From Swiss-Prot:
Keywords: Chaperone, Cytoplasm, Stress response. This is Protein GrpE. The keyword Chaperone applies. It comes from the Bacteria. The lineage of its organism: Bacteria, Pseudomonadati, Pseudomonadota, Acidithiobacillia, Acidithiobacillales. GO terms for molecular function: adenyl-nucleotide exchange factor activity; protein homodimerization activity; protein-folding chaperone binding; unfolded protein binding. It comes from Acidithiobacillus ferrooxidans (strain ATCC 23270 / DSM 14882 / CIP 104768 / NCIMB 8455) (Ferrobacillus ferrooxidans (strain ATCC 23270)). Residues 1-20 are annotated as: Disordered. Belongs to the GrpE family. Participates actively in the response to hyperosmotic and heat shock by preventing the aggregation of stress-denatured proteins, in association with DnaK and GrpE. It is the nucleotide exchange factor for DnaK and may function as a thermosensor. Unfolded proteins bind initially to DnaJ; upon interaction with the DnaJ-bound protein, DnaK hydrolyzes its bound ATP, resulting in the formation of a stable complex. GrpE releases ADP from DnaK; ATP binding to DnaK triggers the release of the substrate protein, thus completing the reaction cycle.
Length: 171
């Protein structure tokens, strides 16, 4: 008198079928979650590319706005008539003011002229375009032919300089 119920094969098959359906539903849910995650990643990638492109395109926006007064000043100078010594003096003063505006705009962008310091030749900051024999110490900057510039800690352009060298007899 064993009262244990044995499941019939059809009941087992129904249970297995229900379990298969359950697993299929779970697999479909995981697949949909996976596809959604892939779409999110693709959207994130596209958004990042757009931000990088915008940053590249508009990075100089602030700098360009700083240069507009310089352009205005130059246009004003070109539009004014130049007659006589007084006009030339005013034009020179206007050019000096424009150069000051320009230097301020460059400074706000982190661009600065290379300072000569103690006048020693530095191959990282200077490009020697002439060597001149002198009685003094060798490898000294004698003249700057074109200013060099740095942007923060990066060299934009080296200074073009003449450098001293020892006389031939002393070599």
């Amino acid at each position: 008198m064993n009262e244990e119920k044995e499941e019939s094969p059809s009941t087992e098959a129904e249970g297995a079928g229900a379990e298969v359906v359950n697993w299929e539903e779970r697999a479909e849910t995981y697949r949909n979650d996976y596809l959604r995650a892939l779409a999110d990643i693709e959207n994130l990638r596209k958004r990042h590319e757009k931000q990088v492109e915008d940053a590249r395109n508009y990075a100089v926006d602030r700098f360009a706005r700083e240069l507009l007064p310089v352009v205005d000043s130059l246009e004003l100078a070109l539009a004014s008539p130049v007659e006589g010594a007084e006009s030339i003096a005013l034009l020179r003063q206007g050019l000096e003011n424009t150069l000051t505006l320009f230097a301020k705009a460059l400074g706000k962008a982190g661009i600065a002229p290379i300072e000569m310091g103690e006048g020693r030749f530095d191959p990282h900051l200077h490009q020697a375009i002439a060597m001149v024999e002198t009685e003094g110490e060798a490898n000294r900057v004698l003249a700057v032919h074109q200013k060099g510039y740095v942007m923060h800690d990066r060299l934009l352009r080296p200074s073009m300089v003449s450098v001293s060298k020892a006389p031939k007899a002393a070599q």
